[in-house]
Each structure stands twice: as structure tokens, then as C-alpha cells.
Amino acid sequence: MATLNFRSRTWQVALLAFLCLLLGMTSLFLIAGASIRANPDERTRKLNGDELIVNPIGSVTHAITIRSASRDVWPWIVQMGAGRAGWYSYDFIDNGGHRSADRILPQFQTVGIGSVFPAVPGAKDAFVVLQYEPERSLVLGWVPPGEHAPITTWALVLEDLPPGCTRLIERGRVRSPYRPYGLPEWLTKRLAPLAHAVMVRKHMLGIAIRSETAARDRATTGCPRSLTH
């Protein structure tokens, strides 16, 4: 009787596809109450970093209202990354099992073009800071060795909402050559946004909760509860 080789690339790709599908289907139940839905204007208008990938095969936009000022949200964003403050998401997936920080870490408050926010522990080239405007926007991306343009970009944009609230808008874009683990393009188009939604929901709510808690402790928020996520 023939035995199945679960170490073969075919099985690895199949397993990855199944996991992506499972995560994607889970996201359908989570997103309904996730409070990360971008409004029509946010989904269609141009954001910083869009020009880096002109014709993406995929683009997803999420947004959340945070009950603290943008100046209080920004420190949580600039310290992100595995081995840094974490991604405020599922730490066993993207932070080596180490719990994401629940305080501002002064050693990670400096950012510059080329700074690395490791996607996972040990990563050296993803994600790299491609653009930034203090307290306004951060654009991360991955430029593979030998490439001159990013294959994927991730923009985080902060917009002030009176009084004392912030709208965090995040957009991920992928250009055609990017096919993780050799997955076919059609599968990448369908599964990647769904799987991404699971992670980004946790991540965005993590930023919101941490920022709001810190602002509340300092009694610095003037944002009415009616505007929250």
C-alpha cells in the first residue's frame, strides 16, 4: 500500500491552503462584530504608500475608531514588530509566543526609513519602513533580495476625529509576483484577504485597547464613547 508523504511540497501547500481557508471562514464570523470595517470612502480613496504598488492583485482596507488622540496612538505603532513590542495580535503566530507589550517601550520609539519591524522572530527584510510621517502614517513593506520595488505594502494611517478621537486606517496591498509558498494566484487572491482579516482584527483592537487604557489612566481622552468601535 502506498504511503502518503506529508513532507512533500504538494502536501505542504495543500495544508497551507486548508489552514488559510479555515482562517478565512473563521473571519467571516469574526468580522461582523469586529468593528474594523472601513467605510466606502476609506476603502476607495488614496492612502500613503498606494503609489508603491500601482496595480495590486489584492488590496484590503480596515479601520477602527480609537478613543485617544493620534499622538497617543502613534507610540504603540512605532514599537511594533516581533522581538520588539510584538504585533498585538496572536503572539504564538507572529511573536514567538512572547506576549505583546502592554506599555510604551522607549527603546523602540525611534523610526526611520529602512528600519526593520520583523514580521516574525528573526526576520531581517520584512517589514521595512518605506515611508513615515510622525503621528500621521507609517508604510511598511517587503522588498525581496534582488528586487527594487516592494512586493507587499502595509500602510497605517492616523486621522484625527474631534474631540480627541483617532481613526486608524490600515491597508495591505500585494503585487502579482507575490505568491506565498507557491500558491496559485487565484488562491492567493481569495484566501489572503480573509486570513489577513483574522490577524489584523486582533492587531487593530490590540492597539485600540492599549491606547485607550493608557489615555484613560492619564485622563487625557476627551473622545465621547458614542464614537468608539
Predicted regions mapped to residue ranges:
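N-terminal Sec-pathway targeting helices
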Residues: 2-20
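Glycine-rich portal/gate segments that line the openings of hydrophobic small-molecule binding cavities
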Residues: 15, 45-57, 65-71, 78-169, ...
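Short acidic N-proximal helix/loop "leader" segments that mark the beginning
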Residues: 15-61
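A solvent-exposed interaction/effector surface
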Residues: 26-31, 35, 150, 160, ...
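Short glycine/proline- and charge-enriched loop/turn segments
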Residues: 184-188
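Second-shell loop/turn segments in exported
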Residues: 189-194
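Short, flexible loop/turn segments with low-complexity composition
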Residues: 216-229
